[in-house]
């Protein structure tokens, strides 16, 4: 019996040595950046706090430097930490490292659309989408007018709260939701519309669930966890429902399409489908158009909505900042004129506050994953083709030299000694390079105009003492999700 026990122990020991040997051979095949030694199957998952991955990556960067290798399960991952490394990857190596890493909750979007597309048609889909959005004024005068048209609806909904406590999640959300809906479908939703509310709830739920620990694990071990019960099933159902909604709208547009007149973004993409250049491409299908529309609808709504919601909470925490904004708005815009983008030149404090809100909330701390399109030399190391690349945006937005006291909310981070707006190249809230957010111009415009309009007409009133407001995100993962709260908006006199 004792001999049998010794034999089993020896076999286990030999098997362990063999696994380690095989793993070392795989690990040493390329001159990878340094990093912790991975275990078979689970990789370095034990060195990562799945409930706060960005914090874990920052700690590992202190140990291994600004470029290090990490295995999330069996997936080889290279992490970039700090302004220089992140900028180098996103801009200097934008062709080599511009692929999209897989986000398994969006498998139905794989090789389609813009955000999660890593297929042969991604570049053309993105190029076509950008040119079409430019035609519809993305970041220019056309979208300024769209936002200005939406402002009265937002103000009316806020007045409808009659100074009573309310949850701002979907009321605020309808503003950017309607702007992007107008671009995509030439459609406007009433703030009580149940379809619009349902879509927003799906957006909001997915944004939150994607940031939970379970979804982080699911993206690392999809084949193991896919058939188990869990919140990933809810996300997959939501993604499918949103895609179906977009496909229905695309088919409706197709049935009433006028080849000589474009009503909106969807019409433009459908018209391209009829042309020889794209019509013969195997990747350019109704399904690809539907996913492209779904990508833009989600990104164009939820990121701006969350930023606005977080922004109001921050302003209630710092009433002295709100007071300065009221003074600037009264001086430049007055009590009744609709805010305009030209006002930004005379409103450096509002411009600084908008930028500081985005920096401080650090909405997408680890960016969306990139992937190496080919073997790439980087600072003397090799990043092999297929390696996931994570440019950590939080390491840039919280750089201590560029932003003194980065953990504090300070609009002065974006003001010079004369009180004028000071742009920082470290402001990478929208990423950079070939995967930069296509809606950056629109989002900047919406945040400035919507916040200006709200504060032009209302004072924000917290239900608790400002010093007791907790700005800590309730969930950190795919995104940093703000805590739930209620507030009152009180009409300003005059």
Curated annotation (Swiss-Prot):
Cofactor: heme
UniProt-listed SUPFAM superfamilies: Cytochrome P450
Membrane topology note: Peripheral membrane protein
Enzyme class: oxidoreductase
Gene Ontology terms for molecular function: 4-nitrophenol 2-monooxygenase activity; arachidonate epoxygenase activity; enzyme binding; heme binding; Hsp70 protein binding; Hsp90 protein binding; iron ion binding; long-chain fatty acid omega-1 hydroxylase activity
Gene Ontology CC terms, in alphabetical order: cytoplasm; endoplasmic reticulum membrane; intracellular membrane-bounded organelle; mitochondrial inner membrane
EC number of the protein: 1.14.14.1, 1.14.13.n7
Assembly and binders: Interacts with chaperones HSP70 and HSP90; this interaction is required for initial targeting to mitochondria.
Domain of life: Eukaryota
PANTHER family: CYTOCHROME P450 2E1, CYTOCHROME P450 508A4-RELATED
Residues bound to heme: 437
Protein's GO biological process: 4-nitrophenol metabolic process; epoxygenase P450 pathway; lipid hydroxylation; monoterpenoid metabolic process; response to bacterium; steroid metabolic process; xenobiotic metabolic process
Pathway of action: Lipid metabolism; fatty acid metabolism
Catalytic activity line of the entry: an organic molecule + reduced [NADPH--hemoprotein reductase] + O2 = an alcohol + oxidized [NADPH--hemoprotein reductase] + H2O + H(+); (5Z,8Z,11Z)-eicosatrienoate + reduced [NADPH--hemoprotein reductase] + O2 = 19-hydroxy-(5Z,8Z,11Z)-eicosatrienoate + oxidized [NADPH--hemoprotein reductase] + H2O + H(+); (5Z,8Z,11Z,14Z,17Z)-eicosapentaenoate + reduced [NADPH--hemoprotein reductase] + O2 = 19-hydroxy-(5Z,8Z,11Z,14Z,17Z)-eicosapentaenoate + oxidized [NADPH--hemoprotein reductase] + H2O + H(+); (4Z,7Z,10Z,13Z,16Z,19Z)-docosahexaenoate + reduced [NADPH--hemoprotein reductase] + O2 = 21-hydroxy-(4Z,7Z,10Z,13Z,16Z,19Z)-docosahexaenoate + oxidized [NADPH--hemoprotein reductase] + H2O + H(+)
Binding site for substrate: 298-303
Similarity section: Belongs to the cytochrome P450 family.
Species name: Canis lupus familiaris
Database matches in InterPro entries: Cyt_P450 (IPR001128), Cyt_P450_CS (IPR017972), Cyt_P450_E_grp-I (IPR002401), Cyt_P450_E_grp-I_CYP2E-like (IPR008070), Cyt_P450_sf (IPR036396), Cytochrome_P450_fam2 (IPR050182)
Protein name: Cytochrome P450 2E1
Task performed by this protein: A cytochrome P450 monooxygenase involved in the metabolism of fatty acids. Mechanistically, uses molecular oxygen inserting one oxygen atom into a substrate, and reducing the second into a water molecule, with two electrons provided by NADPH via cytochrome P450 reductase (NADPH--hemoprotein reductase). Catalyzes the hydroxylation of carbon-hydrogen bonds. Hydroxylates fatty acids specifically at the omega-1 position displaying the highest catalytic activity for saturated fatty acids. May be involved in the oxidative metabolism of xenobiotics.
Protein keywords: Endoplasmic reticulum, Fatty acid metabolism, Heme, Iron, Lipid metabolism, Membrane, Metal-binding, Microsome, Mitochondrion, Mitochondrion inner membrane, Monooxygenase, NADP, Oxidoreductase
Ways its activity is controlled: The omega-1 hydroxylase activity is stimulated by cytochrome b5.
């Amino acid at each position: 019996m004792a001999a049998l026990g010794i034999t089993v122990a020896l076999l286990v020991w030999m098997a362990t040595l063999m696994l380690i040997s095989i793993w070392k051979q795989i690990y040493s095949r390329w001159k990878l950046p340094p990093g912790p030694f991975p275990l078979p199957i689970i990789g370095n998952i034990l060195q990562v706090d799945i409930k706060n991955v960005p914090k874990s990556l920052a700690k590992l960067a202190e140990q291994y430097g600004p470029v290090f290798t990490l295995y999330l399960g069996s997936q080889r991952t290279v992490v970039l930490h700090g302004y220089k490394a992140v900028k180098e990857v996103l801009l200097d190596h934008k062709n080599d490292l511009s692929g999209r890493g897989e986000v398994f909750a969006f498998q139905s979007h794989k090789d389609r659309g813009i955000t999660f597309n890593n297929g042969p048609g991604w570049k053309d889909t993105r190029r076509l989408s950008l040119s079409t959005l430019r035609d519809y004024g993305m970041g220019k005068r056309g979208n300024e007018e769209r936002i200005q048209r939406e402002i009265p609806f937002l103000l009316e909904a806020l007045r409808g709260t009659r100074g009573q406590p309310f949850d701002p999640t979907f009321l605020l959300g309808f503003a950017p939701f309607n702007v992007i809906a107008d671009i995509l479908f030439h459609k406007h939703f009433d703030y009580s519309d149940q379809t619009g509310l349902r879509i927003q709830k799906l957006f909001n739920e997915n944004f939150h669930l994607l940031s939970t620990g379970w979804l982080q694990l699911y993206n690392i071990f999809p084949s193991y966890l896919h058939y188990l019960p869990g919140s990933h099933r809810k996300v997959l159902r939501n993604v499918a429902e949103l895609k179906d909604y977009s496909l229905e709208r695309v088919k409706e547009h197709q049935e009433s399409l006028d080849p000589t007149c474009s009503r909106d973004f969807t019409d433009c993409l459908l018209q391209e489908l009829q042309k020889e250049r794209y019509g013969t491409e195997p990747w350019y299908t109704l399904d690809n158009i539907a996913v492209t529309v779904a990508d833009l609808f989600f990104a164009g709504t939820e990121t701006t909505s969350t930023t606005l919601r977080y922004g109001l909470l921050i302003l209630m925490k710092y009433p002295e900042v709100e007071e300065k904004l009221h003074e600037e708005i009264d001086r430049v815009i007055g009590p009744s004129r609709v805010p305009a983008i030209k006002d930004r030149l005379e409103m450096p404090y509002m411009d600084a506050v908008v930028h500081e809100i985005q920096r401080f909330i650090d909405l997408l701390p680890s960016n969306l994953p990139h992937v190496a399109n080919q073997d790439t030399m980087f600072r003397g190391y090799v990043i092999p083709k297929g390696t996931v690349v994570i440019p950590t945006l939080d390491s840039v937005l919280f750089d201590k030299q560029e932003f003194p006291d980065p953990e504090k909310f300070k609009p002065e981070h974006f003001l010079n000694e004369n009180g004028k707006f000071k742009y920082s190249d470290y402001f990478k809230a929208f990423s950079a390079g070939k995967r930069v957010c296509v809606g950056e111009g629109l989002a900047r415009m919406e945040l400035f105009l919507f916040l200006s309009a709200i504060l032009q007409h209302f004072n924000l009133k917290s239900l608790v003492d400002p010093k007791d407001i907790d700005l800590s995100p309730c969930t950190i993962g795919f995104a940093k999700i703000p805590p739930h709260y209620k507030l009152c908006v009180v009409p300003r006199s005059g």
